[in-house]
Amino acid sequence: MAIEKLPPQLANQIAAGEVVERPASVIKELVENSLDAGATRVDIEIDKGGSKLIRIRDNGFGIPKQDLSLALSRHATSKLKSLDDLEAIMSFGFRGEALASISSVSRLTLTSRTETQAEAWQAKAEGTEMAVQILPAAHPVGTTIEAVDLFFNTPARRRFLKSDKTEFTHIDEWLKRIALVRRDIHFTLKHNGKSVRNYRPAMTEIQYLQRLGQVCGKAFAETCLHISCSHNDLTLSGYLQAPGAASGYCETQYFYVNGRLVKDRLVNHAVRQAFSEYAAGVSPGYVLMLELDPHQVDVNVHPAKHEVRFHQSRYVHDYILQALQSAMAQSSELGLEAQPEPTDESGAAFESNSTNSNVSSTSYSEPNTKPVAVNERPLTTTATSYNQGQSSYRTPLRPATHRADVELPSQSSLEAYASLLSRSSAEPASGKVVSNPHASAVSDASVKMPAVLADKYWVIVEEDSIRLLSIADVIKETARQQIQAKLAQGLVGQPLLMPVAVPVDDNWNEVIETREILLRKLGIELSIRLGQLIIKKVPPYLRDSQLAVLIPELLQWIRFEEPSDDALVHWLTTQASSRFTASAEAWLAFSTLDSSAKSALYNQSQELPWQQWMKESQSD
């Protein structure tokens, strides 16, 4: 049989087999075109599950009269001009197939008007006719597309459509998905003349939580954790079902890449792996939005654009994993039960009784460094902050030797604690009452942890004094003693789940060879391969650090000198100080300190002039 070129109408119908699967796919293509056209409102109207009528109306830029015919032809688009554009796609559509495919299997009417046109124009096309009629029409700025009698000319395809209810369910589900990621758009949906959905623009977080509740259910919206993190050119935001609220399989699983809803096994694996520590075998709900350089992701790998291919898939996987693990660990350590966390100017989080929202917020930030990393763990900035001075991922390799001034809590807060001493003996204050300030009974493991003030201090109430003991100082001293005891025998390195890779420097190979014994003593295992420094193992004290920055700084340091054990202990202590929390864990760690360290820390605590406050209060 001779090879012949297919007629345009037949070619369009073949293409429609991939693009137009059911009414929901028609609505997907048309609404995405509306969003690409800058619409802020999209109205969807369907009859009989979309098989009889699909009408999409938007207030976008519109299509000029001279482009109407071209818009209904194959491979005609305003989204791409060159191959470079294909490598960095940010729009939903880019192939120029949707309108041609839809018009080949339905009776399509396209009415549009641009802001510069005095009147609107209408284009009509039917599946059996390739000719397009252009007529004047009345229409505001924007576009309306009607697709009537879907698959009227392909009876076999029409027989495969499900019931009206089933087809409507697919449409409703797709609308929910797009409503979650495009919070700035007003979406409405009518079925058989009845208003079914009305998603108003969600410009504030409270409004978005209301939309989240509409789409995912009130239970999810009230118990989810807010995720917001950024690292280099990657930004992850959204909501994750709290471990305590998840069980079995949750159908609320939406993942977006640069605003495009995709299905990716890599993401599902990262979420399940992050959850395994808290609830093994659970597939939790999530609404996650990943933004990255469009050059780092290929969206042109699936006919319906449901899948993407990341250029650094392992990097993306581990980035999502670490972000979710950090969020859940933080919520667990702070004892959060889906409560919001307002932050002060330094980024420290405080407990709140706000009733505006039940979503726990977790945020991350990182300086603008440029390593090509495969596995990096972001450090939260809303964690319980007793190392308040740190505002980025890492601490300097050579921290300043002087101690920063500690900001005291407000006097009104302290006066509240002063009132503890005025209570009767029948109502003892929380904390340990001791007669000897140098007695180590205050740190007895059997003693209940004292009250915590501003996530920075323990309030130690004695017979005749109130003292503030810095949690940061306790954590630092605890880590220092542990590291000092273990460094003499050598630290044990822990393999990383995914090795970290950074571009290699010319002299690093020599440094690794000459300082091999020192690196082994620190529990750090490195190798160089294909121009990359591969970080394989680190001691537990460094696992929460930004390794892609920290290890190169370490190599630069030991290149010119061999640090003493004291210097190494000081460096490791600085990195490890963020591993603890202002909780019973830190208090228990305090009890492991020797008596001299406890006394030294106690002497550094700040005594409050509560008696003077009482006198001033009585005189007033």
Swiss-Prot record:
Record-level GO BP terms:
mismatch repair
Locations of Low complexity compositional bias? 352-365
Q: Which residues form a coiled coil?
A: none
Pfam families, per database record: DNA_mis_repair, HATPase_c_3, MutL_C
Q: Name one GO cellular component term.
A: mismatch repair complex
Q: Where is the composition biased (Polar residues)?
A: 378-394
Q: State the UniProt keywords alphabetically.
A: DNA damage, DNA repair
Q: Which PROSITE patterns match?
A: DNA_MISMATCH_REPAIR_1
Q: What does this protein do?
A: This protein is involved in the repair of mismatches in DNA. It is required for dam-dependent methyl-directed DNA mismatch repair. May act as a 'molecular matchmaker', a protein that promotes the formation of a stable complex between two or more DNA-binding proteins in an ATP-dependent manner without itself being part of a final effector complex.
What PANTHER family has UniProt attached to this entry? DNA MISMATCH REPAIR PROTEIN MLH, PMS, MUTL (PTHR10073), DNA MISMATCH REPAIR PROTEIN MLH1 (PTHR10073:SF12)
Concerning its family, UniProt says: Belongs to the DNA mismatch repair MutL/HexB family.
Q: What is this protein called?
A: DNA mismatch repair protein MutL
- Organism listed in the record: Shewanella piezotolerans (strain WP3 / JCM 13877)
Gene designation? mutL
